[in-house]
A protein has these predicted regions:
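Positively charged, low-complexity terminal tracts
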Residues: 1-85
């Protein structure tokens, strides 16, 4: 099983002024159980715009995905933003 959950295509408007040296990245989140152990994992793919197929894909166990979620939650709090649900 593979299923796309969400993706975010890069937009020039996403960059703050003065961030000329920042990579233009798009990301996608999916789930997959196409492994020898058949355990479902969360797949996070990050690709530089214009380099389709050359991105990095992380295959996260549920515990690893929760740790990433917590890190994003904490980062949002650090910059004074509500972390959401």
């Amino acid at each position: 099983m593979r299923r796309s959950i969400d993706d975010y295509p890069f937009a020039e408007a996403d960059l703050p002024s003065g961030a000329d040296d920042v990579a233009h990245l798009s990301w996608a989140v999916a789930i997959s159980d196409d492994y020898d152990d058949a355990e479902p994992r969360v797949v996070l793919t990050v690709e530089e715009v214009g380099r389709t197929g050359a991105g990095l894909a992380g295959h996260f166990t549920p515990d690893m995905a929760r740790r990433l979620r917590l890190a994003l939650h904490d980062a949002l709090c650090e910059i004074g933003e509500p972390p959401g649900a």
